[in-house]
Amino acid sequence: MEDVQNSPAQVAMPIDRVGVKNLQLPLVVSDRAQGRQHTVATVDIGVDLPAHFKGTHMSRFVEALENWTEELDYASMKRLLEDVKTRLEARKAYVLFRFPYFIRKKAPATGSPGLVCYQCRLTGELEEGRPSFLLEVEVPVMTVCPCSKAISDEGAHSQRAVVRIAVRMTRFSWLEEFIDLAEVSGSSPVYTLLKREDEKYVTEDAFAHPTFVEDVVRAAAQRLERHPQISWFRVEVESFESIHCHNAFASIERTITPETQPGS
């Protein structure tokens, strides 16, 4: 049977990345409270393609994922990338897992439990035997405007915001570490299940800790700078303003070295 993929390309130009996107599969991730958590991932996976090949072998990406049944961590991702690189005879391999991660949070007053969903991404790349990984998580929080509180006789405007954290790490860290870090940087965490006593607590607690997006991003960045396993981070806070027809945002990006580590 003719192998069209290996025939000469009409335009001899190398391709940086080619593969498959939005492939869904079950996934097991590490869970600080339960040990393991079963979720569903949407996966992008690809390799580079030399200029002389017309096309890649798309089925081999799916085969690699079908044969990969491990719990998601850096070591298992590296093995997957090595397998893809070998199957496709490529110099570079890439994989991105997007998945929801759930934490059962207790309401602050009544202790009523409710699952909160956090959107996560883990990207892995392998080139010349050297892997690199990028972990991203989105954390919803509540913010109360300090200016509105200061100038108003009654109340202040409040809204939901999202803290987006991206980190490169030297060693494994729990997702919960970054979720906790983001939640304490806002005016208040948000919850799925709140009774009246809980709503009272959350409202009063948030109004006691008013924050601009600038405050939230600085607080989160300061905590990330102190994290011993982080070599680089980016944090962005986006506030879905309740009294404006636009959103507010702030972002900070830093590379952490022994010289820039706080306390060094």
Curated annotation (Swiss-Prot):
List GO BP terms, alphabetically.
tetrahydrofolate biosynthetic process
Q: Which Pfam families match?
A: GCHY-1
The pathway to which it is assigned is:
Cofactor biosynthesis; 7,8-dihydroneopterin triphosphate biosynthesis; 7,8-dihydroneopterin triphosphate from GTP: step 1/1
Encoding gene, per UniProt annotation: folE2
Task: Spell out the family assignment given in the record's similarity comment.
Answer: Belongs to the GTP cyclohydrolase IV family.
Q: Which domain of life is it from?
A: Bacteria
Site keyed May be catalytically important: positions: C145
Name of this chain's protein? GTP cyclohydrolase FolE2
Q: Does the keyword Hydrolase apply?
A: yes
InterPro entries assigned: GTP_cyclohydrolase_FolE2, GTP_cyclohydrolase_FolE2/MptA
Return the HAMAP family for the record: GTP_cyclohydrol_B
- Which keywords does the record carry? Hydrolase
Could you tell me the EC number(s) of this protein? 3.5.4.16
Asked if the keyword DNA damage belongs to this entry, the reply reads no
The terms under GO molecular function for this entry are: GTP cyclohydrolase I activity
Q: Which residues form the signal peptide?
A: none
Q: Name its species.
A: Nitratidesulfovibrio vulgaris (strain ATCC 29579 / DSM 644 / CCUG 34227 / NCIMB 8303 / VKM B-1760 / Hildenborough)
What is the documented function of this protein?
Converts GTP to 7,8-dihydroneopterin triphosphate.
Catalysis performed (reactions): GTP + H2O = 7,8-dihydroneopterin 3'-triphosphate + formate + H(+)
